Amino acid sequence: MIKVGILDSTLREGEQTPGVIFTVDQRVEIAKALSDLGVSMIEAGHPAVSPDIYEGIKRIVKLKKEGIITSEIVGHSRAVKRDIEIAAELEVNRIAIFYGVSDLHLKAKHKATREEALRTIAETISYAKNHGVKVRFTAEDGSRTDFDFLVTVSKTARDAGADRVSIADTVGILYPSKTKELFSALTREVPNLEFDIHAHNDLGLAVANALAAIEGGATIIHATVNGLGERVGIVPLQQIAAAIKYHFGIEVVKLDKLQYVSSLVEKYSGIPMPPNYPITGDYAFLHKAGVHVAGVLNDPRTYEFMPPETFGRTRDYTIDKYTGKHALRDKYEKLGVKISDAEMDQILAKIKSNTTIRFYRDVDLLELAEEVTGRVLKPRPPEQIEALISVKCDSNVYTTSVTRRLSVINGVKEVMEISGDYDILVKVQAKDSNELNQIIESIRATKGVRSTLTSLVLKKM
């Protein structure tokens, strides 16, 4: 029977993404969101790196003690006693000690022999255990380490007191069949020890390798929200969670909360989500080709691996030159507009003849229908309202601090600092005018906001 959980490393590995820095408050909020999501472990950072990381972990551990956060809290540490002491004084649940074990790392980085490395690993793990915490050892560059030596390293870590060893594919060179073979062999050769995989995504194989590691016996997968991390990052949390559910039937996190957590980290990291990103991208459940849309309208399983509602999403489709009559009729029915078959054919012909328009929005379709029918058409109220809120800040405040406060208001989709008469531009979405007014009032009530100007979005090209 497969047993697997998620260690989320957004606050440690994720912050190693170039250009990404989380404030203390952001670290705490992300940790709470990850706990609510249901990850098994939160790697909260490397406390010896900087005072803000230390303070962030301190506050996260406090929330853990209060029962607000339920995930196991992990502190990162070099194989250095002072690092271990700093992590231990924070009273984290587990200290994760890392050390490069490949011959390349031993020679180029540590300037140590294999024997010296084994002594360092044993001594530091034992030292951490003496502080009364659980210990994980990370075999950095484990995927390029001689297998027999990797077995010796794992046994040394186990015998010194570690109950977990993480195999790091540090430069992302593993491939699935090799990964399964590696973990199968390790779990066979080193009993009474559990293994993690820390898979980097340099070749785009991190998710596939994580699934293969599960098949080989790994019980914890390291992931980050949106796949953040050094260079091109590691396993994206939303992708591996969906894949584990689909292939193994195991729900390692609350899937319907992935969208919120992804958006939260997108805002705080400043790394935009590509629209075609799996699971949480704008296009993940958006269909285009006429044959596809017709299939989805009859039975969504034709072109969806799982229902979007599983992930707190909804399906939609675009209208353009690829559109068929099924999609167009469904769109007009949703708008509450009655169109005859002959009129529908004329509208569709106009759409297909205009090859330069990327998306036909609802307002475009209404204009086309009125042009063809000669009638003034009254659609149902829109399902959502989009607006742009221009914000002017008080002269004595730091604009970025206001931007951060605005970015976490419900309904706010994007926040941009701009030049000109206003300081910030906020993109918002609301289901109706009442909700829009509530969002606007929340923006106006934000500390540092002097005035606002609201513009409704009528059409997108």
Curated annotation (Swiss-Prot):
GO terms for molecular function: 2-isopropylmalate synthase activity; homocitrate synthase activity; metal ion binding. Gene3D superfamilies: 1.10.238.260, 3.30.70.920, Aldolase class I (3.20.20.70). Mg(2+) binds at E13, H198, H200. Its cofactor is Mg(2+); Mn(2+). 2-oxoglutarate binds at R12, H76, R136, T170. Pathway: Amino-acid biosynthesis; L-lysine biosynthesis via AAA pathway; L-alpha-aminoadipate from 2-oxoglutarate: step 1/5. Residues 4-259 form the Pyruvate carboxyltransferase domain. The active site is at H292. It holds the Pfam family HCS_D2. It catalyses: acetyl-CoA + 2-oxoglutarate + H2O = (2R)-homocitrate + CoA + H(+). It comes from the Archaea. NCBIfam families: LysS_fung_arch (TIGR02146), PRK00915.1-2 (NF002085). This is Homocitrate synthase. The lineage of its organism: Archaea, Thermoproteota, Thermoprotei, Sulfolobales, Sulfolobaceae.
